[in-house]
A protein has these predicted regions:
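Conserved active-site alpha-helix within GNAT-family acetyltransferase domains
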Residues: 1, 127-151
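Short amphipathic alpha-helix that is part of the acyltransferase structural core
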Residues: 2-53, 68
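Short beta-strand-to-coil "C-cap" segments at the C-terminal boundary of structured domains/repeats
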Residues: 10-14, 148-154
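A conserved beta-strand-loop-helix scaffold within acyl/acetyltransferase catalytic domains
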Residues: 51-70, 74-92
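Conserved acetyl-CoA-binding loop-helix of GNAT-fold acetyltransferases
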Residues: 93, 99-112
């Protein structure tokens, strides 16, 4: 059985500290970087069960946050849909770079960019086990009870 997912939201109200260098690119700028595109596909292919969802999500991506290691190789990505509110669809960090705060930096920089651009909310859906990461980045879970509809007793 798969782990339950939670929905999260963040209302950016101030700039947050970012612990690692993160590039925040438009999707058009990102696709011009062929090595980074190949690296993202490689990571998505190995870390997620289905590539179909990624392919379905990609046409709506407006921004990509990228972290590069000291050699310049992209080792962390975050994809953003951006109609009015922003939706984070993928946060991907290569196995050898995990545990270094890269995911936190990608999320924090995305929240900062949202704040600077006047975006009202940033939302995402993720596994429940990642709740500490997203809460540390200023996100609040929308608990299932909050979505429940209670009928009045007769």
């Amino acid at each position: 059985m798969s782990e339950p997912e939670l929905h999260y939201f963040c209302k950016p109200t101030a700039l947050r500290p970012v612990t690692h260098s993160v590039e925040f690119l438009s999707a058009q700028e990102f696709v011009a970087d062929e090595p980074a595109c190949k690296r993202l596909w490689e990571l998505v292919s190995t870390q997620f069960r289905t590539r179909g969802k990624f392919l379905a999500v990609w046409p709506g991506v407006r921004f990509v946050a990228v972290h590069r290691n000291t050699e310049g190789r992209a080792d962390g990505f975050l994809l953003v849909h951006a109609p009015i509110n922003w939706q984070i669809d993928y946060v991907v960090v290569c196995a050898e770079a995990r545990g270094q705060g890269i995911a936190s930096a990608l999320v924090a920089e995305t929240a900062n960019q949202a704040f600077l651009r006047g975006v009202p909310y940033v939302m995402l859906t993720s596994r429940q086990s990642l709740r500490p990461l997203y809460e540390a980045c200023g996100f609040t879970p929308v608990l299932p009870e909050a979505n429940a509809c209670t009928l009045p007793s007769e």
